[in-house]
């Protein structure tokens, strides 16, 4: 039976240390938040909160904001980390940390001494919400923690590295990309999706595939696919 392991302690601590090296300790302490795995099982609630609290203690973080998109969507399995990322992008854009509204109170066994787990939507103050830690806490050792930096912080770094002139040119070129993205979003919101679906078109005629003892010849490709001829087991 799978159970929590030490892996997530490692990934979470290394992710925070990485962010400290990039953005500085004060930005991490005052400007980061956690997008928890938050699968809401009894073991997950207790063990994940303990990881966050102990990492917070190690890096002198207080009142670390925690949210969990699964409280809205449930566990979408494979796409779950994508759900978390989309949620973080929303926090960056709107400055609102979604509350965990699926519970009436935080269970007493959850160690949240250094955490802030809002049960209602929370408006972040200026300077907060600059760094997101996306946590994946799979029982049995499948653990990962991703670090996502806000557009504001990223733009700050780009200006510092490339200068104002180069950054202004980038912003000018990016306007067209934004217009296209906004147009697509508007169309998608209206259900106007022109999906490209070309099943079987421009494919390879399977009858023209040639197979012999030396290899396989595929129409449209100059070189054939040859078989491996090295004898890996000479004693056989």
Task: State where each predicted segment sits.
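Conserved "HGTGT" condensation-loop signature of ketosynthase/thiolase-family condensing enzymes
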Residues: 1-236
């Amino acid at each position: 039976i799978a159970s929590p392991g030490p892996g997530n302690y490692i990934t979470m601590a290394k992710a925070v240390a990485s962010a400290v090296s990039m953005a500085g300790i004060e930005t991490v302490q005052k400007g980061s938040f956690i997008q928890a795995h938050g699968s809401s099982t009894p073991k997950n609630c207790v063990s994940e909160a303990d990881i966050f609290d102990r990492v917070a203690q190690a890096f002198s973080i207080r009142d670390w904001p925690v949210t969990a998109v699964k409280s809205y969507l449930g566990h979408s399995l494979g796409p779950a980390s994508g759900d978390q990322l989309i949620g973080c992008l929303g926090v960056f854009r709107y400055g609102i940390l979604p509350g965990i509204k699926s519970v009436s109170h935080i269970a007493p066994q959850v160690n949240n001494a250094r955490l802030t787990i809002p049960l209602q939507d929370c408006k972040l103050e200026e300077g907060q919400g600059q760094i997101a830690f996306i946590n994946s806490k799979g029982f049995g050792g499948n653990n990962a923690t991703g670090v996502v930096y806000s557009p504001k912080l990223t733009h700050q770094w780009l200006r510092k590295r490339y200068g104002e002139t180069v950054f202004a040119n980038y912003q000018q070129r990016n306007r067209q990309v934004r217009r296209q993205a906004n147009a697509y979003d508007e169309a998608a919101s209206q259900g106007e999706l022109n999906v490209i679906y070309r099943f079987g078109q421009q494919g390879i005629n399977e009858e023209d595939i040639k197979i012999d003892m030396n290899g396989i010849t595929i129409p449209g490709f100059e070189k054939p696919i040859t078989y491996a001829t090295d004898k890996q087991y000479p004693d056989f």
